[in-house]
Curated annotation (Swiss-Prot):
Residues 23-84 form the TRAM domain. Belongs to the class I-like SAM-binding methyltransferase superfamily. RNA M5U methyltransferase family. S-adenosyl-L-methionine binds at Q287, Y316, E340, D384. This is Uncharacterized RNA methyltransferase SCO5901. Its EC number is 2.1.1.-. The lineage of its organism: Bacteria, Bacillati, Actinomycetota, Actinomycetes, Kitasatosporales.
Amino acid sequence: MQAEPKKSQAEQRAVAEPVSEPVSLVGEEYEVEVGPVAHGGHCIARTSEGQVLFVRHTLPGERVVARVTEGEEGARFLRADAVEILDPSKDRIEAPCPFAGPGRCGGCDWQHAKPGAQRRLKGEVVAEQLQRLAGLTPEEAGWDGTVMPAEGDKLPAGQVPSWRTRVQFAVDADGRAGLRRHRSHEIEPIDHCMIAAEGVSELGIERRDWPGMATVEAIAATGSQDRQVILTPRPGARLPIVELDRPVSVMRVGEKDGGVHRVHGRPFVRERADDRTYRVGSGGFWQVHPKAADTLVTAVMQGLLPRKGDMALDLYCGVGLFAGALADRVGDQGAVLGIESGKRAVEDARHNLAAFDRVRIEQGKVESVLPRTGIDEVDLIVLDPPRAGAGRKTVQHLSTLGARRIAYVACDPAALARDLGYFQDGGYRVRTLRVFDLFPMTAHVECVAILEPAAKGL
């Protein structure tokens, strides 16, 4: 019988001395001076021991009592809520929403800040990400630092724009609809969401019981009266009879396949943008703010300045919003190729743009499909990637196609900044950057960066 190897002294100590569990700091309170805003809807502070705190429900320059919500001794950082404001900022207001605040609804980040201050804070986040990840100052990115509100959203302090045309309500064990608390599966029951668009509020989702449902998503299309509800049942649950305050089509998420299936009514809604109607299938992507699609199309087309006869790419094209705008502008002698990974979105894009012989829509991942097309030269590129961004490999490929201008649409300034750095490595420079507040009361923004070959800017 072979003898076991002798344990080292360190191994013997590890057996003799069981490893202690990290000590949770949840619930601990610290009086702190609040520093700058950070990406994600919180501000940075430090404990007296120097540990970093990411604090929600506060503003830069305030002195607050911060209660830890996540983290342990020795962790790189802690998460916390400001539960007492000792020295308030001049930008602080009382949150208009009765469901906002520490431990409450997680749908909004800046209910406690004046609207102008919200936009200023978002601008500071974008500027910090540009500098840190792309090495660009606002001036070098062609941006004046302004975060522009959507048309109609510039309201006095205390008033909240009702902008969210898609709201997914979570349902608790008692069948009550609400919204999830921040970074939690716990549900805050509500009777009204202030940022929900009028068409969503009119349905009365929050005023009904939803037994057996996990989520209820409400959609109110822009430019049509289409209303839709998507139900996600809990395992084994039966669908309730849907009786709402307005006519709706009803879909359900399949328990086995996760697909969205028709119960009754149209399996899509009709959205309107750039003087065109777009069919968007159940579960498909469309901008949530009613002014967002037109705002972004205008910004992209003003930046690209398409010409008759141009060859253009629309990458991550969804249901064809930018491809349609490009097709109108490049004319019969031009061509547009859209690439989208979602099967249903591709079907919708082909339907929406069927009148254009010059538009082709391909299904698949951009990094896989684009090399297979054999395209080695284009005039214009639009890319509107998911939150994670396009990534180094895709940006490197796009940088070889000789595009006269590139429009990058992004909902995450960190991913945008990383990819702008890759474009710079590939010989492009940022000509202009525009930042839009299309998600009021939240930490999110939408950016449109226009790039051109660096040699052109010399």
